[in-house]
Each structure stands twice: as C-alpha cells, then as structure tokens.
Amino acid sequence: MNHQPPPVSRIGWDDQKIMRTRRELDSVKAIMKENVQKIMERQGKLDDLVERAQRLEEASDVYVKCAVKIKREMSWKANSLRYGIIAVSSVSAFAGLAYSFL
C-alpha cells in the first residue's frame, strides 16, 4: 500500500538531464539567496529611514516650540516699546497740562 515514486534511473532521465536540473536548481538557489540578502539590506535601510524620520519629527517639534517662544518674546518687546512710548507721551502731556494750569 506504500506508493513510492520510482527511482530517477527508472524514469528514463539520463545523467545529463539530472546534472542540468541540478545546475538550474543551484542557480535558482543562488538567486534566492541573493534576493533574501537584498531584502535584508532593504529592511536595514528602511529601519534607518524610520529612525531618521523620527529624529526629524522630534527636531521639528523643538523648532516649533522655539519659534513660538521667540515670537512671544518679540511680541512682548514690541508691545512694551509701544506702551513705553505711550506712557512717556502721556506723562509729558499731563505734565504739560499741569504746568499750563500753574
């Protein structure tokens, strides 16, 4: 009841066909090994790209925070200069009015 395929020699293959098939098999194995190696290299490159993208994202977050902080500081400086000029003008105007009533 055990059905095994007949040995290669009984199928009618000669040594040349077997050798040609083995060479083809070796060629396919070499190509597959090369493909697996390329896949592994690509995976490494993809991992590097993911890491670089994460670092760029972190750097952009820091940049945005710094830009917002600088914008606030510049706005505060600009407004304080305006308020200072208004205050000095107001004091001068009141002083002028007060002097004119004397």
Curated annotation (Swiss-Prot):
Q: Which Pfam families match?
A: Synaptobrevin
- Keyword Coiled coil: yes or no? yes
Superkingdom, according to UniProt?
Eukaryota
An example Gene Ontology molecular-function term: SNAP receptor activity
Repeat is among the record's keywords: no
Q: Known CDD domains for this protein?
A: R-SNARE
Sorted alphabetically, the Gene Ontology cellular component annotations on this record are: plasma membrane; SNARE complex
| Coiled-coil annotated spans | none
| Name this protein carries in UniProt | Synaptobrevin-like protein 5
What organism is this sequence from?
Caenorhabditis elegans
User: What is the gene called?
Assistant: snb-5
